[in-house]
Amino acid sequence: MGRISSGGMMFKAITTVAALVIATSAMAQDDLTISSLAKGETTKAAFNQMVQGHKLPAWVMKGGTYTPAQTVTLGDETYQVMSACKPHDCGSQRIAVMWSEKSNQMTGLFSTIDEKTSQEKLTWLNVNDALSIDGKTVLFAALTGSLENHPDGFNFK
């Protein structure tokens, strides 16, 4: 058997640590959901402010069928963007949320489809003036799947 030099052992150790850091970071992003934002100690207040004055269905808090969070940059602010839909009926109700950990700001878009008319109703949640155009573009892209299909296409300076 060959010997492993101390340099080789160091490389293996660094590689192992790097793999764990990457896996932990990816797992943390994958674990970020709209329902976890609604219930989280540091995010609950921002979520409640976002939905204030709106009655959302229970599945939003309990957890729907969701997509993993994606990172989007608007200006100099970085956001985690995620979406979810009503379990077993994704076509009828969907929600997309943008959250900035830096400013602890949250904004969203809720969509319902009228079964009789097939018309979609969009409800904007806590969209401030700074986010009005680009933020709405990103939220709608998350809602429709465009953000997931083109993740680098929605970063705006």
UniProtKB/Swiss-Prot annotation:
Main localisation: periplasm
Gene3D superfamilies assigned to the protein according to its UniProt record, in alphabetical order: Inhibitor of vertebrate lysozyme
Disulfide bond sites: C85-C90
Localisation per UniProt entry: Periplasm
Pfam families: Ivy (PF08816)
One GO process term, biological-process aspect: chaperone-mediated protein folding
Molecular functions per Gene Ontology: lysozyme inhibitor activity; protein homodimerization activity
The organism's place on the tree of life at top rank: Bacteria
InterPro entries, A to Z: Inhibitor_vert_lysozyme_sf, Inhibitor_vertebrate_lysozyme
Signal peptide (from-to): 1-28
Key words, A-Z: Disulfide bond, Periplasm, Signal
Aminoacyl-tRNA synthetase as UniProt keyword: no
Keyword Amino-acid biosynthesis assigned: no
GO cellular component, one term: outer membrane-bounded periplasmic space
Site (Important for lysozyme inhibition): H88
Functional note: Strong inhibitor of lysozyme C.
Subunit structure: Homodimer.
Family that this chain belongs to: Belongs to the ivy family.
Protein name stated in the entry: Inhibitor of vertebrate lysozyme
Organism: Escherichia coli (strain K12)
